[in-house]
């Protein structure tokens, strides 16, 4: 049975979370797009996935994840270090965990952080941080991995986030695969598999057609031979 992954992108719409240097771009819209791409990647890798409805409050999202029997609860957010319109100075991913270092949450969050840092281009070390106040961390009985992907109030980070929505989704998927010990299937590999399946189906159809023609011809020859006796 497939593991169940529940995705919860930022629920607050504009004007929450403006992206520095990108007028009209907001955290909600970006994380919803990343969540949809992550869902597609996870399904490609064999996982069952649900994405929270954009309008659902946190309580409803957590309740839905619990009722569904989610194995892994994945909020998707981008970060901010300033509450003003000035550019923030902080950069880089961080992942929020509950419990002590070495526990299940911390280890899963470390996997997500390590995967993000394989993609992120700058040398930062925000790491995994303990959080016991966020609702989607302290009210989720299943494993919760809470990435803050980068800082949307920093120009360089905002650019990186917008230029890498697809790669970020693949990175989050790789982290899930690493946690559960399953194979990550890259998009190209999946496409090649689908192409191979289509090619095989076409060859099998040709084979069946030629076999049918052979049987018909054999019957005609047999009938002709019988008529000549």
Predicted regions and their residues:
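Active-site histidine-acidic residue metal-binding/catalytic motifs
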Residues: 1-62, 68, 89-91
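N-terminal catalytic cores of peptidoglycan-degrading enzymes
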Residues: 3, 61-62, 68, 72-75, ...
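Active-site-adjacent mobile loop/cap segments within catalytic or ligand-binding domains
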Residues: 3-8, 12, 17, 68, ...
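A short, glycine/acidic-enriched catalytic loop
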Residues: 14-26, 80-111
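Long, well-ordered alpha-helical scaffolding segments within enzyme catalytic domains
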Residues: 33-44, 102-121, 158-186
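Acidic, proline-/serine-/threonine-rich low-complexity intrinsically disordered repeat tracts
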Residues: 187-197
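Alpha-helical coiled-coil heptad-register detector
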Residues: 195-198, 202-219, 223
């Amino acid at each position: 049975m497939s593991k169940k992954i529940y995705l919860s992108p930022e629920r607050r719409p504009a004007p929450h979370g403006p992206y520095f240097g990108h007028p009209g771009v907001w955290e909600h819209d970006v994380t919803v797009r990343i969540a949809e791409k992550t869902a597609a990647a996870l399904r490609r890798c064999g996982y069952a996935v649900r994405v929270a409805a954009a309008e659902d409050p946190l309580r409803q999202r957590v309740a839905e994840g619990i009722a569904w029997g989610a194995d892994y609860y994945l909020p998707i957010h981008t970060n901010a270090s300033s509450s003003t319109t000035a550019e923030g100075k902080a950069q880089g991913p961080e992942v929020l965990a509950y419990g002590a270092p070495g526990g299940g949450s911390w280890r899963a969050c470390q996997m997500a952080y390590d995967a993000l840092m394989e993609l992120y281009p700058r040398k930062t070390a925000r790491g995994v941080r303990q959080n016991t106040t966020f609702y989607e961390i302290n009210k989720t009985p299943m494993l919760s991995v809470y990435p803050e992907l980068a800082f949307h109030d920093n120009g360089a980070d905002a650019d990186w986030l917008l230029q890498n929505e697809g790669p970020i989704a693949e990175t989050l998927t790789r982290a899930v695969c690493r946690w559960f010990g399953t194979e990550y299937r890259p998009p190209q590999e999946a496409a090649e598999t689908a192409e191979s399946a289509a090619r095989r189906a076409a060859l099998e159809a040709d084979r069946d057609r030629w076999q049918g023609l052979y049987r018909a011809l054999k019957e005609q020859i047999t009938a002709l031979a019988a008529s000549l006796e």
